[in-house]
Amino acid sequence: MVVARTLFSISATLIIFLALFLHVNAVQETREPKHESSRNTSTVDNLSDGEWHEHAVKDPEEIAAMVDMSIRNSTYRRKLGFFSSCSTGNPIDDCWRCDKKWHRRRKRLADCAIGFGRNAVGGRDGRYYIVTDPSDHDPVTPKPGTLRYAVIQDEPLWIVFKRDMVITLSQELIMNSFKTIDGRGVNVHIAGGACLTVQYVTNIIIHGINIHDCKRTGNAMVRSSESHYGWRTMADGDGISIFGSSHIWIDHNSLSSCADGLIDAIMGSTAITISNNYLTHHNEAILLGHTDSYTRDKMMQVTIAYNHFGEGLIQRMPRCRHGYFHVVNNDYTHWEMYAIGGSANPTINSQGNRFLAPGNRFAKEVTKRVGAGKGEWNNWNWRSQGDLMLNGAYFTSSGAGASANYARASSLAAKSSSLVGMLTSSSGALKCRIGTLC
């Protein structure tokens, strides 16, 4: 009897072990890879119209649930008194800013993204590269120690700066894949020349930079990687130009006064989060989508969260075409023409924002449909949920009201618009100092 019980126990143990082994292998075999190839190629040219982009988010409701959990955890920690001196309820900031040793754990930032660009790892898995030289004399053979030398490298890099500096670029700064530009701890300005181009690449993080007074440049040779340089025609003079790229996160930058747009994302770009930025003194702030006829932008998914649209802005906060756009918990304190516009049937999901209309009684409307009559745009899915309208502001909704129509334009759980002031209180490039809370 004892022998029989012993054999039974051993058999049961082996069965449990085998079941666990098979389960682990199944998980490993079905789990999607965390990283993609850093090969600098375009996926846009290989897509047929209407084909879903490989980097677009196929289950945004899952993302919303994940981000909702992070927000709830952030709120729960505040209620318990954790990080009470710095926590704001902003899930991105609460993820890293309460750490006094943030400068020793810079790459933790890559785990704090939310929304459609949440998988942008930047240079997390690479070395640190310290920019020591603000010059930019040769866009084809850049000098080691310069920002241009760093961004063209083929390997992943987390790029930081040795000291405060103003970088005036001679030609557009064309970034290679898997790069983070991290301006925390110093005061870095990219100003008075060309600015940033994110073209046919993936996994880019741009954080903590002052970008302003960008000029049109071009008709010159410019290097885009260690092995390639080529002729560039005239660039528009955008602050950040995103072209045919995916997994992009633009966070805590201050942008103003550029020749064209402050941030443009076009030509099949997707999986983008624009968060915690401070935008001022500009006409056409953010363009999302190339042209009405470029239907490959139907795959575009962009999250715009916790930004402050401030003094001197006129329009395009953002201006959307074709794709899916989640505009959530932003603070709109200034516009002269309109705040959110679009054409070519974009889906716009506006949630928990604060809109303060200008004094001009003809500019109170938040929204603007471009190039279409009411008979056409009345079918476009644009909705406002929980937005706070001040000084006569109003949002003209259209399309179906059912939540299912906004699934692909949902990327995180909105907080109450009454909290927007707190959520956006630190928008723009932060004045972090090493050894203290940021």
Swiss-Prot record:
<feature type="glycosylation site" description="N-linked (GlcNAc...) asparagine">
    <location>
        <position position="46"/>
    </location>
</feature>
<feature type="signal peptide">
    <location>
        <begin position="1"/>
        <end position="26"/>
    </location>
</feature>
<feature type="glycosylation site" description="N-linked (GlcNAc...) asparagine">
    <location>
        <position position="73"/>
    </location>
</feature>
<dbReference type="GO" id="GO:0045490">
    <property type="term" value="P:pectin catabolic process"/>
</dbReference>
<dbReference type="InterPro" id="IPR002022">
    <property type="entry name" value="Pec_lyase"/>
</dbReference>
<keyword id="KW-0479">Metal-binding</keyword>
<protein>
    <recommendedName>
        <fullName>Putative pectate lyase 14</fullName>
        <ecNumber>4.2.2.2</ecNumber>
    </recommendedName>
</protein>
<feature type="glycosylation site" description="N-linked (GlcNAc...) asparagine">
    <location>
        <position position="40"/>
    </location>
</feature>
<dbReference type="InterPro" id="IPR012334">
    <property type="entry name" value="Pectin_lyas_fold"/>
</dbReference>
<dbReference type="GO" id="GO:0030570">
    <property type="term" value="F:pectate lyase activity"/>
</dbReference>
<feature type="active site">
    <location>
        <position position="316"/>
    </location>
</feature>
<feature type="binding site">
    <location>
        <position position="264"/>
    </location>
    <ligand>
        <name>Ca(2+)</name>
    </ligand>
</feature>
<dbReference type="InterPro" id="IPR011050">
    <property type="entry name" value="Pectin_lyase_fold/virulence"/>
</dbReference>
<dbReference type="Pfam" id="PF00544">
    <property type="entry name" value="Pectate_lyase_4"/>
</dbReference>
<comment type="similarity">
    <text>Belongs to the polysaccharide lyase 1 family.</text>
</comment>
<keyword id="KW-0456">Lyase</keyword>
<feature type="binding site">
    <location>
        <position position="236"/>
    </location>
    <ligand>
        <name>Ca(2+)</name>
    </ligand>
</feature>
<dbReference type="InterPro" id="IPR045032">
    <property type="entry name" value="PEL"/>
</dbReference>
<keyword id="KW-0732">Signal</keyword>
<dbReference type="InterPro" id="IPR018082">
    <property type="entry name" value="AmbAllergen"/>
</dbReference>
<keyword id="KW-0325">Glycoprotein</keyword>
<dbReference type="GO" id="GO:0046872">
    <property type="term" value="F:metal ion binding"/>
</dbReference>
<keyword id="KW-0106">Calcium</keyword>
<comment type="pathway">
    <text>Glycan metabolism; pectin degradation; 2-dehydro-3-deoxy-D-gluconate from pectin: step 2/5.</text>
</comment>
<feature type="binding site">
    <location>
        <position position="260"/>
    </location>
    <ligand>
        <name>Ca(2+)</name>
    </ligand>
</feature>
